Amino acid sequence: MASQQLDGKYISLIWSKGMRKRKCLIAGNWKMNGTLESLSEIVKIDKASVQLDSDLVLCVPNTIIHAASEKITSTKLLIGAQNCHQEENGAFTGDISAKMLKNVGAKIIIVGHSERRFECGETSSLVEKKAAASIRMGLPTIICIGETEEQKIKGETETVVCSQLERSMPDASNDLNTIIAYEPVWAIGTGKVPTLEDIAHVHRRIRNVLKQEKGKDISQKMRILYGGSVKPDNAKEIFSLEDVDGALVGGASLKADDFINIAKKAQTRCS
């Protein structure tokens, strides 16, 4: 992945072909899966990445971040974390800061995943603080947003998604340090996927909110990922949508072959 120094910090570039278009990002979220024995899958993905045009990310458990980072030889694959504390240090038993994650090799951090929002009670206000902490450490940050099935049935998708986006983005967010991931909660791990029209509509709405919050230039450059039961057999159609710039992949990222096949589906979009 190309990079540059901005205020002495690592920042991921998102442009290809002479800075003309958003470059695809395929991010894997391993959740609470993976041990040292799983590093062989990461090695396979690392080797395959040199043949791919997309940027690749694997957010693995904290326990294997360092070991995974040591295995990476490609510049197209980053190892990341799935969460961080909003403070740099202190009396927060069991938590880990962005500074600590960076110290062991994390190059990017996910914040605001629905499993953190709903199972751990994290609010958008807290997500914003976590994103700000990650960005302060010079780590590109994936901010997750998405509605529940109940909210979808009530017709609240746009209201929920836009509110989460507005409240979860720190002032420091821009196209170089922030990636948005739209993950309808009801689609995560269920096999259910919104229609292409629905995905396109929500991503377009997110792009419009980014324009209002960050201005036209940043809104056109910031990547928006789709997440929720993304698999090799549906990825190509999803990636064909104008405002979809990649995917946040769950279970399918645990197996190198599946993850690589998803990334290959983005080739036509990235080339």
Question: What does each of the following model-derived ranges do?
Answer:
Residues 5-6, 10:
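Cationic, low-complexity basic patches in intrinsically disordered or flexible, solvent-exposed regions
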Residues 11-271:
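Active-site loop-to-helix "anion-binding N-cap" substructures in soluble metabolic enzymes
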